[in-house]
Amino acid sequence: MLKLEPEFPGLPQRCDSCRSAPCAFYCLADSAALCATCDADVHSVNPLARRHRRVPMGVVAAPGAGGAFVVRPAGGVNSSWPIREGRRCDYDDDDADAAGEEDEEATSWLLFDPLKDSSDQGLPPFGDALVADFLNLGGGAGEKEDASSSKDCSSSHGKSSEGSHEFAVPGEPVPERQGFGAVSMDITDYDASNFRRGYSFGASLGHSVSMSSLENMSTVPDCGVPDITTSYLRSSKSTIDLFTAAAGSPVAAHSIMSPPQFMGAIDREARVHRYREKRKTRRFEKTIRYASRKAYAETRPRIKGRFAKRSDTDLEVDQYFSTTADSSCGVVPTF
């Protein structure tokens, strides 16, 4: 570790650049103690030099235990860190304060109290209060709070909705439901005998579902949402045919809904049938490809069915018979 040895003990350290003025700043990147003038000259050359971190130096104390001089900041707080290491600066207090604020903010996020914040800011219940609302379906305090909140919303927004949504087929009267009732569902049976070909059919499917009983389970009352009427679209022809077949015969419905699983077996059966028909018309006659070879083989002498060696007389006889055969049968073309 480099040491700063003052020329005169007890006097301020001189500048490492000009060696005349007392040093005012210490630069850790340059490892130099500079006066104000030299510091401005050195660190104004380029943007990289401007980013060097400098420590304002106070009075240089006596050498410490490590043999290096110690910086005493202007605030009067003595530092026990050597200057060459540059571990002490007057920004430490600011860093500590910032770290303390970050710790407090993290603690506030980790120890978040939803019930306290919701009661202070007027937000809907959260956490245990929400579970209490779900469990309190029979009435009581939760019902009173919901009734009061819905009354306030209805006074501010007008008669927009009472928290119930009706789902019905267009053309049918929708019954008016008031208060908190159970979920009701009316389903008209489908009559397959009244089915007519085409897109129109006489039977009707009606579904009326009241969602008013679910209002107890909602944390925020639905005040500004208008009445929602959902219309069921008319089914397509393929869908109608499918349900009609299902109502008429379960076997037909199963054959329609199930994918074709036996196509491979049908194809194999057709291939086997074609093979059998072809085998019936098959002929086992030998096809003579070379007529000259056949005629030559017929004239060769055989011993027990096998060809034997020929003598000179046999060759003459063969030639005689071959010329006779050629004159009678004609010339056999060769390819």
UniProtKB/Swiss-Prot annotation:
One GO molecular-function annotation for this sequence?
zinc ion binding
Q: Which InterPro entries match?
A: CCT_domain, CONSTANS-like, CONSTANS-like_Bbox1, Znf_B-box
Q: Which CDD domains match?
A: Bbox1_BBX-like
**Would you identify the family this protein belongs to, as annotated?**
Belongs to the CONSTANS family.
**What keywords are annotated for this sequence in UniProt?**
DNA-binding, Flowering, Metal-binding, Nucleus, Transcription, Transcription regulation, Zinc, Zinc-finger
Q: Decide whether keyword Ribosomal protein is in the record.
A: no
Inducers of expression? Circadian-regulation under long day (LD) conditions. Expression increases after the beginning of the dark period, peaks at dawn, stays high four hours and gradually decreases until sunset.
UniProt domain CCT: residue ranges: 268-310
Describe the task this protein carries out: Probable transcription factor involved in the regulation of flowering time under short day (SD) conditions. Functions as a repressor of flowering under SD conditions, independently of HD1, EHD1, MADS50 and MADS51. Controls flowering time under SD conditions by negatively regulating the expression of HD3A and FTL.
Kindly list the ranges of residues that form B box-type zinc fingers according to the record: 15-57
Q: Does the keyword Nuclease apply?
A: no
Q: What is this protein called?
A: Zinc finger protein CO3
